[in-house]
Regions:
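Residues that scaffold, gate, or flank divalent-cation-dependent active/transport sites
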Residues: 1-113, 117, 242
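Acidic, metal-coordinating catalytic segment for phosphate/diphosphate chemistry
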Residues: 24, 321-420
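DNA-contacting surface of Y-family translesion DNA polymerases
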Residues: 5-7, 14, 206-347
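Short acidic, glycine/serine/threonine-rich loops at helix termini
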Residues: 24-27, 50-54, 160-168, 232, ...
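Short Gly/Ser/Thr- and Asp/Glu-enriched loop/turn motifs at secondary-structure junctions
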Residues: 111-115, 155-158, 296-300, 345-349
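Long, highly charged, low-complexity intrinsically disordered interaction regions
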Residues: 130-193
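Short beta-strand-to-loop capping motifs
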Residues: 118-122, 321
Length: 420
């Protein structure tokens, strides 16, 4: 058992904007987000398009994030609209500016467009008598200035504030919940299934279930050394988190020690393996171009092919010779994908990530590669980059992008994969 008296007990807030995309879209149309049935859909012209957000009233009909357009009932009281990413970003920035009235920038961590952390340990007492009263004040200001409802988790650390918000605050009438170290046995440990916990996926859950671990309490009490032996550093983190311990600080989140450049895509229909390869090539083209724009080369490649049902294939590989050329990356990805992927399966998600960068001019010459040909490939790639920058990303494309499987041209002009 851990001694919580030795741990720092801070006042960390996790703030989530309720049904953010749907709420912003409602407010823009002069509608009440809590009374309107509205869905924000990636592309209203495609029946397989994913629902990005739904208002609470629409969720009562079973439509939620991840549903498909064709699942939404055809009713006159249901609004179906495309996203407006520029508007969402503007509102998100406005909310962050409200938070920054009370704390310095280093005490705020933007977790996503609609969720952020604040460490108010050293500041809340200047504005309110208690942390809870401060949260009420902040929620009220955000609503009055933007029309957005928020839920707030208060915790001794980032982990507890996040789980307090996810598990309890969203269901409380006032939208606020507070979890401290002393609440761990009564609030954290009963959580099940395990995948409802912040850091556990279905695959890890299945492995834990085989060991008789079904609740977070079971995980917290399981011998630490066995978790470490089976799961490595993940096992260490799981045991600490199951006991409510998270020693990361909001301020430390500004220090990016191992940045990566990545791209992922949810496909609009089920793809066969050969079709999925086309989209993967398009994703690789994008990330390779972004690496070149930074004048870097990448050493580590991580990719994933996700099946339409559960599961999929993911692999990480570290190159001996770092690169920023699409053909090098694609060759590595396909080498492993051809061996690991189920050719009869259908695919719905793809992702590619590059990391472990060094400067382009620090790459060592290789005796086993035609450096003259490589220079020509680099010049060609950078020429295409310049054309894309000057005109558009659609000015030069591979033939496969014009096939039925290609998605590049359908995504031109989108921000974060969605319409502006």
């Amino acid at each position: 058992m851990y001694n919580y008296h030795l741990l720092e007990d801070r006042d960390v807030l996790c703030i989530d904007q309720k049904s953010f995309f749907a709420s912003v879209s409602c407010i823009e149309k002069g509608l009440d987000p809590l009374e309107t049935k509205l869905a924000v859909v990636a592309d209203t012209k495609r029946q397989g398009s994913v629902v990005l957000a739904a208002t609470p009233k629409l969720k009562e009909l079973g439509i939620k994030t991840g549903s498909r357009l064709f699942e939404i009932p055809h009713r006159n009281d249901i609004y179906i609209i495309n996203p407006s990413m520029r508007k969402y970003l503007n509102v998100s920035v406005a909310i962050s500016k409200i938070a920054l009235r009370y704390i310095p920038p280093e005490d705020l961590h933007q977790y996503s467009i609609d969720e952020f952390f604040m460490d108010v340990t050293d500041s809340y007492h200047r504005f309110s008598s208690t942390v809870h009263a401060f949260c009420e004040r902040l929620k009220r200001e955000i609503y009055e200035e933007t029309g957005i409802y928020c839920t707030v988790g208060i915790g001794s650390n980032m982990l507890l504030s996040k789980i307090a918000m996810d598990v309890e605050a969203k269901h409380n009438q006032n939208g606020i919940a507070e979890w401290r170290y002393q609440d761990v046995p009564t609030k954290l440990w009963p959580i099940q299934p395990l995948r409802d916990f912040w850091v556990i996926n279905r695959r890890t859950e299945a492995k834990l279930n085989k060991r008789g671990i079904f609740t977070i309490g079971d995980l917290a009490k399981y011998p630490y050394k066995f978790l470490k032996k089976e799961f490595g550093i993940l096992g260490v983190d799981m045991h600490l988190h199951a006991n409510g311990i998270d020693q990361s600080k909001v301020r430390e989140k500004h220090k990016i020690s191992n940045p990566s450049i990545c791209k992922s895509q949810i496909l609009m229909r089920d793809y066969h393996f050969d079709e999925a390869k086309v989209v993967m090539q398009e994703l690789i083209e994008d990330v390779a171009s972004r690496v070149r724009a930074r004048k870097k080369v990448a050493r580590t490649i991580h990719f994933a092919f996700g099946y339409s049902d559960e599961g999929g294939v993911h692999k990480q590989y570290t190159l001996k010779d770092p690169t920023n050329l699409e053909k090098d990356i694609y060759k590595v990805v396909m080498h492993f994908a051809d061996k690991l992927c189920n050719k009869q399966a259908l695919y719905r998600t793809l992702s590619i990530s590059l990391s472990q960068f060094i400067n382009e001019d620090e790459r060592q010459l290789s005796l086993f590669e035609d450096e003259y040909q490589r220079k020509r490939d680099e010049c060609l790639a950078k020429t295409i980059d310049q054309l894309h920058l000057k005109y558009s990303k659609g000015i030069v494309s591979k033939a496969v992008s014009f096939t039925e499987a290609g998605t590049k041209h359908g995504r031109l002009g989108l921000m974060a994969g969605h319409k502006m």
